[in-house]
Amino acid sequence: MLSQIAICIWVESTAILQDCQRALSADRYQLQVCESGEMLLEYAQTHRDQIDCLILVAANPSFRAVVQQLCFEGVVVPAIVVGDRDSEDPDEPAKEQLYHSAELHLGIHQLEQLPYQVDAALAEFLRLAPVETMADHIMLMGANHDPELSSQQRDLAQRLQERLGYLGVYYKRDPDRFLRNLPAYESQKLHQAMQTSYREIVLSYFSPNSNLNQSIDNFVNMAFFADVPVTKVVEIHMELMDEFAKKLRVEGRSEDILLDYRLTLIDVIAHLCEMYRRSIPRET
């Protein structure tokens, strides 16, 4: 049986909170909701050893100031940043590091992915710890990096490994979240989420200045932690290409352009293979 994951959510929108609670309703998650930046800072200071993962909504007031204060106070934990306050579309995932170098980004419309992205955030933090924080950039790009903070991060990583059973991210995957073990309704929801995520990858694949890498990472995280077979990924790709082909035929245009998107499929599968490679525990 997997240990509970303690998640602290800083959210000031009732609608977003409800979406988060719906996605993380399983007994596996213990949620602490902070309705303001002040509440978050107070809770993080008094319960820093009881937070496994932070979910931070970028549209919250004083977001950057609060996150900066977390860094300066040495509260650096696995994190997911939702939305992007500096974008023309604040619902989209952020395009830059806002808290630390191991944070993951989700759009507000992608919150159904949270069960898989929480696992991914924990795994990424453990892989990169000690991570570079926003405070490091402020202090001359890390020239004055606090060694005590690095030590605290390593201690947190060790605590997570011991309590949650991380030897490699493969061993942390929750079998109850595997595609083959999901109830029919949940399986359909996952399939739809992956279709939507893959569509975003395809539509932005050849666009400059897109958030492509984050989109691919989000899709691969879902595929990996749900133990989705590569054949299913290929199926999702082919379904989308068939849909696009029908539209092109209706418009009287050539379907040859779709051949270029074979690169998209190869890229996504390569990322998934890399995720599996990294999951193999290092020999001791």
From Swiss-Prot:
State the organism of origin: Synechococcus elongatus (strain ATCC 33912 / PCC 7942 / FACHB-805)
Entry keyword annotation includes Membrane:
no
- Which GO molecular function entries does the Swiss-Prot or TrEMBL record give? identical protein binding
Effect of inactivating the gene: Not essential for growth on low light, loss of circadian cycle and rhythmicity.
Q: Which Gene Ontology BP annotations are present?
A: circadian rhythm; detection of redox state; entrainment of circadian clock; positive regulation of circadian rhythm
Any idea what this protein is called? Circadian clock oscillator protein KaiA
At the highest ranks, the source species' classification is:
Bacteria, Bacillati, Cyanobacteriota, Cyanophyceae, Synechococcales
Per UniProt, what does mutating residue 178 to S/I do?
Induces an arrhythmic phenotype
- InterPro entries reported in the protein's UniProt record: CheY-like_superfamily, Circadian_clock_KaiA, Circadian_clock_KaiA_N, Circadian_clock_protein_KaiA_C, KaiA/RbsU_helical_domain_sf
Q: According to its UniProt entry, what is the function of this protein?
A: Key component of the KaiABC oscillator complex, which constitutes the main circadian regulator in cyanobacteria. Complex composition changes during the circadian cycle to control KaiC phosphorylation. KaiA stimulates KaiC autophosphorylation, while KaiB sequesters KaiA, leading to KaiC autodephosphorylation. KaiA binding to the KaiC CII domain during the subjective day yields KaiA(2-4):KaiC(6) complexes which stimulate KaiC autophosphorylation. A KaiA dimer is sufficient to enhance KaiC hexamer phosphorylation. Circadian oscillations can be generated in vitro by incubating KaiA, KaiB and KaiC with 1 mM ATP. The cycle is self-sustainable for at least 3 cycles and resistant to temperature changes. A very robust clock is reconstituted with KaiA, KaiB, KaiC, SasA, CikA and RpaA; output is measured by transcription from an appropriate reporter.
- Record key words, sorted: Biological rhythms
Q: Where is the KaiA N-terminal domain?
A: 1-164
Please tell me, according to the UniProt entry, what happens when changing residue 166 to C.
In kaiA4; induces an arrhythmic phenotype and reduces the interaction with KaiC
Question: Is this entry keyworded Ribonucleoprotein?
Answer: no
Family under the similarity heading: Belongs to the KaiA family.
The protein's superkingdom reads Bacteria
